[in-house]
Regions:
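Cytosolic nucleotide-utilizing catalytic cores of signal-transduction proteins
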Residues: 1-130
């Protein structure tokens, strides 16, 4: 059993394994999103953030998504967004104030990212249906 665990842990950085994991997650969200949508489930924090983006022409939703996808690493997220680290820190402060949540709390971060993925997939589905 330890040999199998060592083999799997050794493949974490393998591009094929990463792609398989991404497809699995994408598939999970693709099939569960309609159920959440049908039940009327959404996250008020993200709705508030999207409203802030619409009203003030900000990009806080995308900023938060990139930050969470980079495992709350400010340096990596700033690089991904092609912005200065201090700019990201300022945006994260705005996000915290807007959604009134600790985005560095693991459970909160997972919830937000899960709802973001479902929201993004539902938007893609809506675009395809048009």
């Amino acid at each position: 059993m330890l040999n199998r665990m060592a083999m799997v842990s050794g493949l974490e950085n393998d591009p094929v394994m990463k792609r398989e994991k991404e497809w699995s997650v994408q598939g999970l969200y693709t099939y569960t999103t309609p159920l959440f949508k049908e039940a009327g489930l959404s996250d008020y924090r993200l709705l508030r953030l999207l409203q802030e983006d619409r009203e003030n022409n900000t990009d806080l939703y995308y900023t938060l998504k990139v930050y969470l996808l980079n495992e709350n690493n400010v340096t990596m997220a700033a690089d991904s967004l092609h912005i200065h680290r201090n700019t990201l820190v300022y945006r994260l402060k705005q996000i915290r104030e807007c959604i009134e949540a600790d985005i560095n709390d693991n459970e909160t971060a997972r919830e937000l990212l899960a709802f973001m993925m479902m929201y993004d997939i539902s938007r893609q589905d809506e675009k395809r249906q048009k």
